């Protein structure tokens, strides 16, 4: 399971700066989701090959009222969701009563935490450590988030305390043994295809899960890795194994009350990253809302195969249905590769067809293709539509190979590849999707330049080659001398 790290501290200690530094770009921020405080943000981050989810919480002072009190409550809830907490303090301002209150809360909750003394610029690190030692959080790690100083030491300390899962360890072993670290995932014998059911609260996720499982089944499977993990529900259908990753919480047959279903961003993001296929559930009567776009964007960024289920389709008038379909085409253009199903989870209409799309999307996401096949498609695409000229020179694309899966990563080699326009990349992506008959999965294309790998290198001759070269040169000199003597 992907670990969750929360940034906590009073206002203006540099949490957002640290968040943007670790996520590397503001584009990684999922954004302000409806129903959550605007100061609470979630991002997908990685450090030296290890992925984690980062939470930027609102500031906590201890004397909040009104809306600020609600924000502080949300920040404290984020602490509960996290595997690890980075407790940021301001080295310039020194220790405050708010810092002491937060430290006390972390101790009471028995949370694993590291004290981070931020804004250490032009301040003696030892003095800063001594300043905050009364907090009882151990030695503070000094950093300057705005400049990136101390970040390496901080992340090594944090990730060193979080155990690696089996997949990470296996990948590390492959790298250590010199094998190509490209993992082509497939359904394990135990889990089958892992399906994450995601969507906003009250769109019908719980009803859909139970409908797909069968009403006669009592859903009591609870295999959490931590106290806030999603519920994993293994089952079989038509001799195929599946595992639902359910973010709606534990429920039993006949006891589903979706109006009180709680939505957890962390659970949803973790479910997306751990799944093979995402079934994204929307409420047809509400249409497409910004919250839907945020969640779909994260699923797309994670590279997951996607199936869209538009629930509560029954009972809608013809005109309403036409309007919703128009809105889907207009607003979901960025996931136009995904199958869309119009269903009623309550009555079961159209639910059975979801399995076919899940199978097709998963197959498209993990199928291997040989280099010869991918290169032939590239050559045909280039013949039909040449890359543009750049400064009078034609961009040359030479060959392609598979670089990864789930999502498919196609690596294309050539010259001037850094100058390929986005429009031509989209053309190649659409060509691969059409020829390979891919459905339900995003495609990523990566370009490699045509640098000569032997440039600047000299061949080293063996002793045998040196002797042979010497004999040939001697023979050549003797032959040349004879020709001169004959003249």
Swiss-Prot record:
Residues 3-166, 193-366 form the EngA-type G domain. One of its GO terms (molecular function) is ribosome binding. Residues 467-487 have a biased composition (Basic residues). Residues 367-451 form the KH-like domain. GTP 1 binds at residues 9-16, 56-60, 118-121. Keywords: GTP-binding, Nucleotide-binding, Repeat, Ribosome biogenesis. InterPro entries: G_ENGA, GTP-bd, GTPase_Der, KH_dom-like, KH_dom-like_a/b, P-loop_NTPase, Small_GTP-bd. Residues 448-461 have a biased composition (Basic and acidic residues). GTPase that plays an essential role in the late steps of ribosome biogenesis. HAMAP family: GTPase_Der. Associates with the 50S ribosomal subunit. Belongs to the TRAFAC class TrmE-Era-EngA-EngB-Septin-like GTPase superfamily. EngA (Der) GTPase family. This is GTPase Der. It comes from Pseudomonas putida (strain W619). The lineage of its organism: Bacteria, Pseudomonadati, Pseudomonadota, Gammaproteobacteria, Pseudomonadales.
């Amino acid at each position: 399971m992907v670990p969750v790290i929360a940034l906590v501290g009073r206002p203006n200690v540099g949490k957002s700066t640290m968040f943007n530094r670790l996520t590397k770009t503001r584009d990684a921020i999922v954004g302000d989701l409806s129903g959550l405080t605007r100061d609470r943000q979630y991002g997908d981050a990685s450090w030296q090959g290890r992925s984690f989810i980062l939470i930027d919480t609102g500031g906590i002072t201890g004397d909040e009222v009104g809306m600020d009190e609600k924000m502080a409550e949300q920040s404290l809830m984020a602490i509960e969701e996290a595997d690890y907490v980075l407790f940021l303090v301001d080295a310039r301002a020194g220790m405050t009563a708010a810092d002491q209150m937060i430290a006390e809360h972390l101790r009471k909750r028995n949370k694993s935490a590291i004290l981070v003394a931020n804004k250490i610029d032009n301040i003696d690190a030892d003095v800063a450590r001594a300043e905050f030692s009364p907090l009882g959080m151990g030695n503070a790690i000094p950093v300057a988030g705005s400049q990136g100083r101390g970040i390496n030491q901080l992340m090594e300390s944090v990730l060193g305390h979080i155990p690696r899962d089996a997949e990470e360890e296996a990948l590390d072993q492959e790298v250590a043994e010199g094998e190509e670290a490209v993992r082509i995932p497939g359904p394990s014998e135990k889990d089958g295809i892992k399906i994450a059911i995601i969507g906003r609260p009250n769109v019908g996720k719980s009803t859909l899960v139970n409908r797909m499982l069968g009403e006669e089944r009592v859903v009591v499977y609870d295999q959490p890795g931590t106290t806030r993990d999603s519920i994993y529900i293994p089952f079989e259908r038509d001799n195929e194994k599946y595992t639902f990753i359910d973010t709606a919480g534990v429920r039993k047959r006949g006891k589903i009350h979706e109006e009180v279903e709680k939505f957890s961003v962390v659970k949803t993001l973790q479910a997306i990253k751990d799944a093979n296929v995402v079934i994204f559930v929307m409420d047809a009567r509400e249409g497409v809302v910004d919250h839907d776009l945020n969640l779909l964007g994260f699923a797309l960024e994670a590279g997951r195969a996607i199936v869209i289920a538009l629930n509560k389709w029954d009972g809608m008038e013809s005109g309403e249905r036409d309007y919703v379909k128009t809105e889907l085409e207009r607003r979901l253009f960025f996931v136009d590769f995904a199958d869309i199903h119009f269903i009623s989870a309550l009555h079961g209409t159209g639910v059975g067809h979801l399995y076919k799309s899940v199978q097709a999307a998963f197959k498209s996401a993990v199928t291997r293709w040989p280099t010869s096949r991918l290169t032939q498609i590239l050559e045909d695409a280039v013949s039909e539509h040449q890359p543009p000229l750049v400064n009078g020179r034609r961009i040359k694309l030479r060959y392609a190979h598979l670089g990864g899966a789930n999502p498919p990563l196609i690596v294309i080699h050539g010259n001037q590849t850094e100058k390929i326009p986005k429009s031509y990349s989209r053309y190649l992506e659409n060509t691969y999707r059409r020829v390979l008959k891919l459905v339900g999965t995003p495609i990523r294309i990566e370009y490699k330049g045509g640098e000569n790998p032997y440039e600047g290198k000299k061949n080293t001759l063996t002793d045998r080659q040196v002797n042979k070269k010497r004999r040939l040169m001697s023979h050549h000199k003797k032959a040349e001398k004879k020709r001169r003597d004959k003249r």
